[in-house]
Amino acid sequence: MRVIELLDKPAVRYEVTEHPPAFTAQQMAAAEHEPGKYVAKPVIVKADGKYMMCVLSACYKIDLGALKNQLGAKSVELAEEKEIGEIFDDCELGDGPPFGNLYDLPTIMDKALETDDHITFQAGTHEKAIRMSMDDYRKLVEPKILEFSYHMTS
């Protein structure tokens, strides 16, 4: 898996945990007993026809209008499931890690994640998660920080 290879190279401290199958970021947060604000989910969008990875908290939803305005794009839309499967060719569908740089995608992180001390995300499968420091994540990925999400209400 590309993400483990990347994390092992610079000797980044991280923890891999196993959990019951989780098919959404919110399910993984519950399985990991982790608040949704610390669980990152990558959302692949097409901005003016170019793929980008947006990283936001599990308990937030993407605001495509806000993203479009901040990018200065003419159009922003969610990528199709088939496209996502082709991008994350080394992962189970829906479990790609939030590392756009591993998939030649620009990475944009939501400002709501910026002050978190750590980040947890799917490790490419429905049964494994990776937890690492936010500082290390930001050094490895160098995401652009924008505000493009809103908190989901119950």
Report residues per predicted region.
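Extended, low-hydrophobicity, polar/charged segments
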Residues: M1-S154
